[in-house]
Design a protein with these regions (language model features):
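Alpha-helical transmembrane-bundle signature of multi-pass membrane transport and export proteins
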Residues: 1-300
Length: 300
């Protein structure tokens, strides 16, 4: 996303186009995860991960080739991002559904936090490496390196120990989705969690899309600086995950979720008005930390 955002802003010089690209990714993620969750309950999850990871690798390779051949247009990026979100709508609930099957219930919150470390570690290291390499080797090479990063995933999947999948009869998918929504909206706690998550995602994730604008126009830095900005939330996420996993005592889930989402939004306000690079980095570290605490809490 770091490279894609910089590429779009460099091609268009328009924050509006960054918004369009972001919308192309966000739109499928509004509706499709409901179906992704149902699919994850009905199919062999290891097979699903093979399919989704292969799809993401293929899309990454397509974008890398377009950039390398100097054929890339904004609409290409929009299509790739949209299709990537469709794949992620199945991949994400599948990965989340795997975690509870691997650990006892009592360790679930810690397991979710450690699960976040894996992906947050990528969010920490990936953008920084991309920002450092891009000026030296070019955007296309960085995108090809991203494609190569899927290789360890394909090596690890056969080693994943999961309960044996037992095929069985299921009701129609649409009915399952409808029943799931009906169940969710008859539980006050679930409604609150969904609304808080939706609001924080809608208004709190725009900094990721607009990071190239902040980097170049506000903080007066280049793609290397953008890489550090994009890595900062990853560092915070890793710290937050380790804090949850190692804590001997934590407040009740509801209270912890409320404090963390409030702090998350306040840190974002601070980032929005900051014109100091170092302060912006620190605020984004805090954003990543609090977002991980909130996510791990509500999933528990």
């Amino acid at each position: 996303l770091t490279i894609v955002g910089w590429l779009v802003f460099d091609m268009t010089n328009s924050p509006a186009w960054l918004g369009v690209v972001g919308a192309s990714r966000a739109a499928p993620m509004i509706v499709l995860p409901f179906f992704g969750g149902v699919i994850a309950d009905r199919m062999d999850r290891r097979l699903l991960l093979w399919i989704t990871q292969s799809g993401q690798a293929l899309l990454s390779l397509t974008l890398a080739l377009l950039v390398a051949l100097d054929l890339v247009l904004v609409w290409h990026i929009i299509v790739v991002m949209c299709l990537g979100a469709v794949v992620e709508a199945v991949d994400q609930p599948t990965r989340q559904a795997i975690v509870p099957s691997l650990v006892p219930r009592i360790d679930l919150r810690k397991a979710i936090a450690l699960h976040a470390v894996v992906f947050s570690g990528g969010a920490l290291v990936g953008p920084a490496i991309a920002g450092l390499l891009a000026p030296a080797v070019g955007l296309a090479t960085v995108l090809f390196i991203n494609v190569a990063s899927f290789v360890p995933v394909f090596i690890a999947l056969p080693l994943l120990h999961l309960p044996r999948f037992e095929p069985r009869q299921h009701e129609p998918i649409l009915k399952s989705v409808r029943d799931g929504l009906r169940f969710a909206f008859t539980r006050e706690l679930i409604i609150v969690v969904i609304l808080v998550s939706a609001v924080s995602s809608l208004f709190g994730r725009s900094y990721q899309l607009l990071a190239p604008v902040f980097a170049r126009e506000v903080l007066l830095t280049d793609i290397t600086g953008l890489g550090w900005l994009a890595s900062a939330p990853g560092l915070g996420a890793v710290l937050g995950a380790f804090a949850i996993a190692s804590a001997r005592w934590l407040p009740a889930n509801g209270r912890l979720a409320g404090f963390s989402v409030a702090g998350y939004l306040l840190a974002l306000v601070g980032f929005a008005i900051s014109n100091n690079f170092g302060l912006s980095i620190l605020l984004l570290v805090l954003v990543g930390l609090l977002n991980t605490v909130f996510s791990a809490t509500v999933r528990t």
